[in-house]
Swiss-Prot record:
Primary location group: secreted
Induction data: Induced in early phase of liver regeneration. Expression is maximally increased 6 hours after partial hepatectomy, both at the liver RNA level and at the plasma protein level.
Organism: Rattus norvegicus (Rat)
Family indicated by similarity: Belongs to the apolipoprotein A1/A4/E family.
A GO biological-process term: tissue regeneration
Descriptive protein name: Apolipoprotein A-V
Amino acid sequence: MAAVITWALALLSVFATVQARKSFWEYFGQNSQGKGMMGQQQKLAQESLKGSLEQDLYNMNNFLEKLGPLREPGKEPPRLAQDPEGIRKQLQQELEEVSTRLEPYMAAKHQQVGWNLEGLRQQLKPYTVELMEQVGLSVQDLQEQLRMVGKGTKAQLLGGVDEAMSLLQDMQSRVLHHTDRVKELFHPYAERLVTGIGHHVQELHRSVAPHAVASPARLSRCVQTLSHKLTRKAKDLHTSIQRNLDQLRDELSTFIRVSTDGADNRDSLDPQALSDEVRQRLQAFRHDTYLQIAAFTQAIDQETEEIQHQLAPPPPSHSAFAPELGHSDSNKALSRLQSRLDDLWEDIAYGLHDQGHSQNNPEGHSG
């Protein structure tokens, strides 16, 4: 609850400025629409601006009154000044005082939630390690199954057109068969990864609940969103691996088909060139797939870091505490601010309701 109020003060001070600026530009825009309605529009715009500032002032005074338990005993809650500059300075002073008192609490909550999310990352790590090992084994398997170099192979390729055509057709069949076989091998790994995400994220929900400053409803939404994002990314990773194998099959098939056409025209066919092509294509498949698995692991880190900030914001001294309003896209920045405010209102409403319920029923937890 205390951490939420600190966030509210920080964001409300910005939000009041945004609202005032919005009313000013509405007032300015209305003045330029037509001279006939100018007087009436000026009056309406001025009333809108005044009402917006008065409402923001009222809201902020209400929040300052609720900071009583966090202040020194016997110290009356302040009333905000009536001028915008006075509001800004007074809010800044109050925010610094409350932030100092809440710093240890918020730091502890942020760290506790971070530990739980690190646990989730460690629980998912074996799945990606297993997947990378399977990629390496699959490349070795395909390398062996599609191997072309050997005394018998070279003699067959150089023995005549019919022998070379027969060997290349067999090679084409092996490419199709073994790439499809390897594709099937990856299905169980994808299923285990998706199942593991669902299971471990639910465990995270239970373990992080005592430490999150978010309301239970918002906590559930955040955890569900995390589960959906990671599940979608895991399925996308599986699709990418399947696509890589399709590309490997098509590239090798094309190369063999060109080689077959050359053999049919009695051109010489170098078995070493065919073997090198297979090796290079397999190395490219392994390299691309490793990068995609690494990107998936990085996505897990990014998503868990984001949810850590949502469930337990960092303390005021942390570089990520302040809202990012200096974004080049002002609409996106304001949208992010509005989303944070919506979350704060929900958490504050829950915190006040829970606190009021505890005060009215001091023995409610004991029966």
